[in-house]
Amino acid sequence: MENQNYPGVFVRVKAVITDSVILLIFMLGIVALFDRFENVPDIARIAAFVFIFLLYDPLFTSIFGGTIGHFLLGIRVKPANNPHKNILFPLAVFRYIIKALLGWLSLITVGGNKTGKAIHDMAVQSIVVFKNQTETL
């Protein structure tokens, strides 16, 4: 993996912005759906909130190798030691928590290392790669 070209900050920021739009669409869809019903149980509202704000990133990252924003931009999140697999769900949750807590600060290390790892990638030993590069490894 040493000869690869890794996604830089700009590509990763575009993925975050894309995911923000996707989450907004999810929220609007859920609100529209709930508006069709007279009495929506609080548990349904809580479950929708948890999925949208807490589980979207870790679930998609652990199951599909990235969020919808990652897919649209052709990047994937993989374990640094095995780019053919997806990171485990508990690691994806921890990665997301660090990313959410640090916000944009987490990306300051992307340009400073040869594999383009953000702080949240370093914490869980993940790496962000271009999709076509995972197919050739």
Task: Go through each PLM region and give its residues.
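Membrane-interfacial and juxtamembrane segments of integral membrane proteins
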Residues: 1-137
